[in-house]
Amino acid sequence: MNHANRRRFLLATGVLLAAPFAGAQPSKDKTAHVGILVMGGRAQRGHLEQALLQGLREQGYVEGKNLVLERRYLDGMMERMPDAARELAAMKLDAVVTTCTPSTRAAQQATSSMPIVMAAVADPVGQNLIASLARPGGNITGLSSQAEDIMPKMLELFASVLPKGAKVAVFVEARSNVHPRMWQALGPVAQALGLKLAKIDIKSPANVTLPAAFETAAHEKADAILVLPDEPVFLTRRALIVELAAKHRLPAFYGVREFVDEGGLMSYGENLRTAYRNAAAYVGNLARGAKPAELPVEQPTKFELVINLKTVKALGLTIPQSILIRADEVIQ
């Protein structure tokens, strides 16, 4: 989709979504029954649940009053996903919010009638989750991430703090459907920037393979780490990843700010809290009787650059003033 067409699509999406969402109130005495299916653990994702609940309050739904939220956090245990999805489908909820590709696909396989709301899922068209962004068809709608599209900009920003000819180890989730395409997209950009890339596959269990991956990166004399976005395996283990990066004194770059909040160096990507809050608008609309097939899928229009200055100093790096000025937030 070219820039002009994408702009027109986003404007149309805004009109379509704003009309039913703005100022809409729940039906009198109506209790919304909503599910959330999460690959990770609640301790690592609780702030995103709070963003969803905030958005639902803005829609007029308050937990304990006129909202029942069925939570299914799987703590990274992929094998539990199909059963959890079927369990939620059997409840005939107003909607179930899915937070990654595996949870969306599991919900899709569990039900063809109950509405499914994606919260920042990568490339739902390419993964055959929906027919198109404008008219998704079926029972899935919500928000798509654009991580694959912004990879060139992400690498360009990260390259600004690395020496020319630096070697970057790229962490790729071995089971991911989208990471292979992200990896391929990085090649030409890295060549133009004078960077060398080394792919490191992260297999299950990540708690074991992540430490080994950092050892591999160090052995291959990598100058930095790039953790590809859009995979719950990495986000759930962000504290471990940040700790290992500090241990090996490797600058590490990320696609979401949660890593930087934990002490990571730098991130560029969409704000997940905003995505979850926006997902609540879809839930509210569906609870009031809208059809998921007719609600366009929203794409992020703003991406944030976040830098942790404490980590910058600990690693002895220098961030160009031009990058600091562009940052949406600099954590002191």
Please name every model-derived segment.
Residues 1-332:
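Short hydrophobic alpha-helices and adjacent helix-cap/hinge residues
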